[in-house]
Amino acid sequence: MVSDTDTTTAIAQPDETHDVALTSWLKSANQHPDFPIQNLPMGVFRTHDLPPRCGVAIGDSIVDLAKLAASSPFDGLAGEALSTLTGPTLNPFMQLPPNYASAFRLALSRSLRADSPMEALIRKTLISSHDVEMCLPCSIGDYTDFYTSIHHATAVGKLFRPDNPLLPNYKWLPIGYHGRASSIVVSGQPVYRPNGQVLRPEAIEPVMLPSEKLDYEAELGIFIGSPSPQFSP
């Protein structure tokens, strides 16, 4: 068993799980360009015979957290956190206070390190990353878009107000807007042109057509864990 009795508060700074000297009993994790033991990113995956489930990437494998939870390997906060990771999304885990996530990460890191007594148990939960398909990690109902690039705001403003592109309030308010998010997919999915009504020149009635000009932009999206109370930022 791995206990987290020494991890009871949120960890704001890098801790022992980020130690560059750490190595794992899983050889593919050592010197891995993306998923060494210092990373341990979480996500949701599925296989041809397993439904969507939570996992952690390590080397060329994924730790099946539902299978790991069945053996109750961790005590305290880490164990409680693991119990929220048996479903098809990370939402229940993300709603926990930060110290739960820190405790879980620490316990998992210790179990994956070289000479860990938990090697045999963890090996039974590993699935090759080549045999999985990644899924959306969370159930996404809506989003808040923060307008944070002053260069982008100025460029857009010039289209509408060439002489006054950046309004004064931009530098004083966290400009943001809220909307629904119904078409988010994981990487590698085909992009479909949206359909809309188009009124051709000289036409009297519009027609429904796929978009003939498709623009795109790159944005940074982040997941924020615990929801804020209603009417509070």
What spans do the regions from the language model cover?
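Charged, compositionally biased non-catalytic regions
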Residues: 1-15
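Active-site microenvironments in enzyme catalytic cores
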Residues: 12, 17-50, 57, 66-233
